[in-house]
Amino acid sequence: MPGTSVSDLSTATAVDAPALLPLPVARPSAPAVVRGKLYIKTHGCQMNEYDSAKMADVLAASEGLELTDNPEEADVVLVNTCSIREKAQEKVFSQLGRWKALKAGGKPVIIGVGGCVASQEGEAIVKRAPYVDLVFGPQTLHRLPELIRARRESGKSQVDISFPEIEKFDRLPEPRAEGPSAFVSIMEGCSKYCSFCVVPYTRGEEVSRPFEDVLVEVAQLAAQGVREINLLGQNVNAYRGAYGADAGDPAQYADLGLLIRTIAQIEGIGRIRFTTSHPLEFSDSLVDAYRDVPQLANYLHLPVQAGSDRILSAMKRGYTALEFKSRIRKLRAVRPDISISSDFIVGFPGETEADFEKTMKLIEDVGFDQSFSFVYSRRPGTPASDLQDDTPETVKQARLARLQAHISAHAASISQSMVGSVQRVLVEGPSRRDPNELTGKSENMRPVNFPGNPRLIGQFVDVLITEAMSNSLRGRIQLDDSAH
């Protein structure tokens, strides 16, 4: 953020985080005059959730638009799209078709399409759905006010799917906390070009936010009561944030390990997470951060995608199953009880039964706690889309069911093993199942429900786990310090 800095960063190393001088304190912004309503429909990943929140911030600050959960009362209606899954485009046009009626009777509703499908399709969206007013990519959401004004003044649809580096972060308003946990985007894009993935084409290559900018945003959120920070990026552990150049010295670069160490020094931050990471960038510096930083959650999401070296090579992942396991061994040497989740693609073109068995062997060897697993979905324009895919869909679905059942059973055993333990839980709010109870998450991402005073919301509490349910844990607040 222009005009702000963290002083004396020139001596920072991957081992010693720079000593922080007082960071800028977040001051409440003057509330914008409400001049209309905004509806946003979000599909896809946590990065999209973050981007949607920033869209709302930008339009509240500049246009006085207030969020609504009813598109029929909105003056601006946006869909933030995801292109990871098959038929993503058709789902978007189906959504737009339903929204076309919002303009009935000449109502001047602005309809906009953002996100990765917008980046892929661009002008084609307006050609197919001429009632769409705005098409904008993930890197141009900060230009929404300009696009809306241009649309209203010219009467023509506006399309901007350019990749202006990291400019969008420089032009976003001060972050607004909405609860004790917050996402902070630290980088955009991916330069790995896995053969199945559209991200480099829809979000561009890797670009990291400056080190100081990230720290200022975290400090502002902490001053508003945020206690847990989740650092976001398509390939978050490739982060290389520049610092030091303002003092006239050549820029230096902070990796994710150093960023975590420094965030841990910010008053109020009690837990740090990050997602999503790539095994190629899982460095010793990051392992050392797990060793040294107690605020770093005892949980890691590290997508492996497959356990067969032949399939990993076809996916262009850049590592073998043995190399992946080596990284996990290093991590467990410093965090023996860490929970690890992963992503898996089943039925990648050319996957044989032997290949799939190697994936199952890897799952058994690593002991994954949770997974996001899917049957391979062909994405047009990616190298993998040209590969011959002759595995029957029924076989793919059977493999997926077997993989998911195995990981679910292991996750259930981990949950059961937590009964009788004391877990540190960040209280997020009332439980959805019982408003008289509170809910939060354990370090390994399990929802925990327990009786408690609503005044505890936003605080960390120790909870004695008394029961493991299918998708959550139950417990009671542990008041006896001797339990540690």
Swiss-Prot record:
This enzyme's EC code(s): 2.8.4.3
One Pfam family in the UniProt entry: Radical_SAM
CC cofactor note: Binds 2 [4Fe-4S] clusters. One cluster is coordinated with 3 cysteines and an exchangeable S-adenosyl-L-methionine.
Keywords for the protein's UniProt record, in alphabetical order: 4Fe-4S, Cytoplasm, Iron, Iron-sulfur, Metal-binding, S-adenosyl-L-methionine, Transferase, tRNA processing
Function per UniProt: Catalyzes the methylthiolation of N6-(dimethylallyl)adenosine (i(6)A), leading to the formation of 2-methylthio-N6-(dimethylallyl)adenosine (ms(2)i(6)A) at position 37 in tRNAs that read codons beginning with uridine.
Domain of life: Bacteria
Domain TRAM: 416-479
Main subcellular location: cytoplasm
Family: Belongs to the methylthiotransferase family. MiaB subfamily.
Gene responsible for this protein: miaB
Database matches in CDD domains: Radical_SAM (cd01335)
Binding site for [4Fe-4S] cluster 1: C45, C82, C116
Positions of region (Disordered): 428-450
Record keyword Phosphoprotein present: no
Catalysed reaction, written as an equation: N(6)-dimethylallyladenosine(37) in tRNA + (sulfur carrier)-SH + AH2 + 2 S-adenosyl-L-methionine = 2-methylsulfanyl-N(6)-dimethylallyladenosine(37) in tRNA + (sulfur carrier)-H + 5'-deoxyadenosine + L-methionine + A + S-adenosyl-L-homocysteine + 2 H(+)
InterPro entries: Elp3/MiaA/NifB-like_rSAM, Methylthiotransferase, Methylthiotransferase_CS, Methylthiotransferase_N, Methylthiotransferase_N_sf, MiaB_methiolase, rSAM, rSAM_horseshoe
Keyword 4Fe-4S: yes
Protein name per its UniProtKB record: tRNA-2-methylthio-N(6)-dimethylallyladenosine synthase
SUPFAM superfamilies with a match to the protein in the record: Radical SAM enzymes
Cellular localization per UniProt: Cytoplasm
GO MF assignments: 4 iron, 4 sulfur cluster binding; metal ion binding; N6-isopentenyladenosine methylthiotransferase activity
Domain MTTase N-terminal: 36-153
UniProt organism field: Xanthomonas oryzae pv. oryzae (strain KACC10331 / KXO85)
